[in-house]
Amino acid sequence: MVKVILNGCSGKMGSVISNLAETKFPNVEIVAGIDNNTKAQRPYPIFAKPEDCNVSYDVLLDFSRADALKSLVEFSKKTKKPLILCSTGYTAEDLKFIEESSKEIPLFRSANMSIGINLVNNLLKKVAPVLYENFDIELVERHHNQKVDAPSGTALLLAHTIQDSLKEETKLLYGREGIAKREKNEICVNTVRGGGIIGDHEVIFAGDGEVIEINHKAISRDVFAIGALKACEYMADKTKAGKYSMDDVLQLNF
């Protein structure tokens, strides 16, 4: 049995993860939660801070906000247990901190836990270099009106994957305004926030005579929870410090 402490247990994703762990993952048990809201109805104890947790566990799973990062890393270092980061909105300084921390603990990070998005991300590694010469590349990401970070972590993941796959130097733009002709080396990430959109990501390869679109639409938060719980199963026995991702969980390398 994989014993998990869930940071952000009282939020929307925390609720979905708790339910799926109970109904579809018989080998995973949420043994405790961490959240500012300690009054949520959960079948496990909820603590306000990581350092308050006194429960034995195998994996610490974070699905909250970027500002929880340092306290979670310190707790994982103290307990010598793997940490899974599923939050987004990290700053450049945060990412550097994550990189350094992975030298001390087994640290998993993914901007999107969906199996589909990770397949799309790997597909882009092959597609972008083939199409770049004759196609302009644009991205559109759409999310609900409560999402606080923009562009989404997933959009940045896809954009950086495209950049890294190309021999040519490109530059990222975030939205467009004013009067200016599009430059060939631009990759623009456009953001939409509205309603209850769970998460849509669209990569557009626009040529003179044809347009290729690669789309992913999340129609249920279950897809993120399933990926997170699979990551918990994968990371439970990891003792070696290092960086891990959904590519490791899904064994993607094509």
Swiss-Prot record:
EC class of the enzyme, as a word: oxidoreductase
Q: InterPro entries attached here? A: DapB_C, DapB_N, DapB_N_CS, DHDPR_bac, NAD(P)-bd_dom_sf
As recorded in UniProt, its EC number(s) are 1.17.1.8
- UniProt GO cellular component terms: cytosol
Q: Where is the active site?
A: 143, 147
Might you name a Gene Ontology BP term for this protein?
A: diaminopimelate biosynthetic process
Q: What is its main location?
A: cytoplasm
Enumerate the subcellular locations listed in this protein's record, separating them with semicolons: Cytoplasm
* Residues at which (S)-2,3,4,5-tetrahydrodipicolinate binds: 144, 153-154
This protein's pathway reads:
Amino-acid biosynthesis; L-lysine biosynthesis via DAP pathway; (S)-tetrahydrodipicolinate from L-aspartate: step 4/4
Q: Name one Pfam family in it.
A: DapB_C
The residues that hold NAD(+) are 8-13, 35, 86-88, 110-113
UniProtKB keywords: Amino-acid biosynthesis, Cytoplasm, Diaminopimelate biosynthesis, Lysine biosynthesis, NAD, NADP, Oxidoreductase
Function of this protein?
Catalyzes the conversion of 4-hydroxy-tetrahydrodipicolinate (HTPA) to tetrahydrodipicolinate.
What family is it from? Belongs to the DapB family.
**What is the protein name given in its UniProt record?**
4-hydroxy-tetrahydrodipicolinate reductase
- Organism this protein belongs to: Clostridium perfringens (strain ATCC 13124 / DSM 756 / JCM 1290 / NCIMB 6125 / NCTC 8237 / Type A)
State the encoding gene: dapB
